[in-house]
A protein has these predicted regions:
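Short structured motifs
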Residues: 23-28, 91-97, 153-156
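Beta-rich interaction/scaffold domains
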Residues: 191-295
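Extended recognition patches within non-cytosolic domains
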Residues: 4-5, 168-196
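Extracellular glycan-interaction surfaces
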Residues: 1-21, 41-51, 70-139
Length: 295
């Protein structure tokens, strides 16, 4: 699929196929994954299948297979499977959850694999800037495997595919640091979902300002409730929003903006910046029970 925004991406829209078609094969998988360390990075948007919606564990974004051992990296139900299959073919006996992975939205992943001191492989997973899961011992070594195969959107041994979109798939020959994995996935997510990230930032800023105001009140800090006349200002400050009611109005407006699905990234970030400025510029009164304007 050629997308006007993201250029060329892989889109899988077929949810079931018994001819071993409609998925992608990662070429040179032996060289890419048959080593003591690597990092697989990818942007993935999981989409709901058209039918067979209960077959969640049989659908994986990436499968790295070596004989009977497999890594199922990101199933439809937000898990990572490892080792041999369990009682159901194509579903790992061992799994960990990555938490809630949004369906229909871009998410950024880093799968960091490393074998230490000759031991079995360990896998750490980062999602959207946060460490989401860790497997200390997957039970086998990819560096000793000689028959590695890897697929996108299909588990080995099943006919179910993980419908969705896949972009920016990169395999690095090293296990990147925790900081690098977090930063990379955070940056990828923001690039794909700028308004979503900006909305989350504004929500956090609203909560931060309200918490700060409550702390100030608990500490006996009193903010001005009346605006100064223009002649009472020193310097060119006439019209500056520096009272508590004005900040409360700005917080209410920010609440409305956050709830507006049409709000732009620029508007959301501008509102967050404005709240910071208004809180920093609040005028305090010199005494709790005085109406004398402070400066």
């Amino acid at each position: 699929l050629t997308d006007d925004t993201w250029n060329t991406i892989l889109k899988v829209s077929t949810q079931w196929n018994n001819k071993n078609d409609y998925h992608a094969t990662i070429t040179d998988a032996q060289n890419l994954f048959g080593r003591t360390q690597f990092t697989l990075l990818a942007d993935v948007m999981i989409e709901e299948p058209s039918s067979d919606k209960t077959k969640t564990a049989m659908r994986s974004a990436f499968t790295i297979s070596t004989g009977s051992n497999r890594l199922h990296l990101l199933t439809y139900d937000g898990k990572v499977g490892y080792g041999v299959d369990g009682s159901t073919k194509g579903v790992s006996k061992n799994e960990i959850s990555l938490g809630d992975i949004a369906i229909g939205e871009w998410n950024a992943f880093a799968f960091v694999y490393k074998e230490t001191d000759g031991g079995n492989g360990a896998l750490t997973i980062y999602v959207n800037g946060t460490k989401a899961g860790e497997i200390a011992d997957i039970g086998f070594k990819l560096s000793e495997a000689t028959d590695i195969a890897a697929t996108v959107a299909r588990n080995v041994g099943t006919n179910y595919l993980l419908t969705g979109q896949y972009d920016n798939i990169v395999v690095k020959p090293t296990a990147v640091s925790a900081r690098s994995a977090a930063n990379e996935t955070a940056a990828r997510r923001e690039a794909k979902n700028p308004s979503t990230v900006a909305r989350e930032e504004l929500l956090a800023k609203i909560a931060e300002i309200r918490a700060a105001l409550q702390t100030d009140a608990d500490n006996g800090i009193v903010y001005a409730t009346d605006k100064l006349e223009s002649w009472q200002y020193t310097g060119n400050k006439s019209g500056v929003a520096d009272t508590l009611p004005e900040l409360n109005d700005a917080l209410a407006a920010a609440d409305t903006l956050v709830a507006d699905d049409a709000a732009t990234t620029e508007d959301l970030r501008s509102a967050a910046s404005a709240l910071d400025s208004q809180y920093a510029g609040l005028r305090t009164l010199p005494e709790t029970n005085t109406s004398i304007p402070g400066t």
